[in-house]
Amino acid sequence: MSEPLKPRIDFAEPLKEEPTSAFKAQQTFSEAESRTFAPAAIDERPEDEGVAEAAVDAALRPKRSLWRKMVMGGLALFGASVVGQGVQWTMNAWQTQDWVALGGCAAGALIIGAGVGSVVTEWRRLWRLRQRAHERDEARELLHSHSVGKGRAFCEKLAQQAGIDQSHPALQRWYAAIHETQNDREIVGLYAHLVQPVLDAQARREISRFAAESTLMIAVSPLALVDMAFIAWRNLRLINRIATLYGIELGYYSRLRLFRLVLLNIAFAGASELVREVGMDWMSQDLAARLSTRAAQGIGAGLLTARLGIKAMELCRPLPWIDNDKPRLGDFRRQLIGQLKETLQKSKSSPEK
């Protein structure tokens, strides 16, 4: 009975919010604490990389302008007119028994058919390259999904596109590891850890081989024009090899588009990553003082080829990078330097013998 009475609560009125101070309380540090104080390092690289990726997507997104629609409509109308006129000429030649004109119409029909077939084939290959980006987005969604039923069919489709046989040991291990109680995220994750590294290892070997050839060619060759032509040819072959490994058949326009994608990715995100991964280690080892100018140029060309191959891998892979499995330039740099030093030592020792 000695407890004080509680104040009345009127439920008809809105609840009163407790006033909150707009200012934080002052914090004071002693002199000893100020000596050991270390500011928190804020990593702004993910935000910068996100801005770069958004810029790449904006640059690569096709722009449907009115002029393009008018040109496409005009070409379609012209093609229909050519086909109609060809049919009319064929009918007239058949009725008048003009066999020479009829043979010309048949030859023209064969040429037009071959051209249409080439256009359809190029469009199909270009569509397949664009579809790989959609598959990568789908894989990213499955890796963050808890649904069931889509992961296995998706991974089997990827294995079929890459040309992996059903009896392959990696694919057999994946089949043995999955079961019905697993969701899509776990199934796709197992595929990324058991099957996808087989293709990635082959792509890494191709990148290492092409980068080493570029490094040695630049370091040995005295002709700059030959170097430029050789590097351009080898880089195009590297892109073709990586695309073939990941099950993408390139045509003329799809090859140009993939090369454009790679160059744009390097332009937006390559410089900062190159400096971050190579610059400090390069200066610490003082390689510029140890190697000649041509050797340094060869290492630079090899690193550029490796960078090109890494970006081609990223654009041709059906799965996004997970668990830091993306290859780094440092992985290829040590190999390039070792091969170049070995070659230079052999070239110096051979005249002495």
UniProtKB/Swiss-Prot annotation:
Pfam families in the cross-refs: DUF697 (PF05128)
Compartments (UniProt record): Cell inner membrane
Region ranges (Disordered): 1-35
Membrane topology designation: Multi-pass membrane protein
Top-level taxon in the UniProt lineage: Bacteria
Keywords: Cell inner membrane, Cell membrane, Membrane, Transmembrane, Transmembrane helix
Biased segments, Basic and acidic residues type: 1-19
Signal peptide: none
Cellular compartments per GO CC: plasma membrane
InterPro entries with a match to the protein in the record: DUF697 (IPR021147), UPF0283 (IPR006507)
Transmembrane portions of the chain: 70-90, 100-120, 213-233
Database matches in HAMAP family: UPF0283
Family: Belongs to the UPF0283 family.
Protein known as: UPF0283 membrane protein YcjF
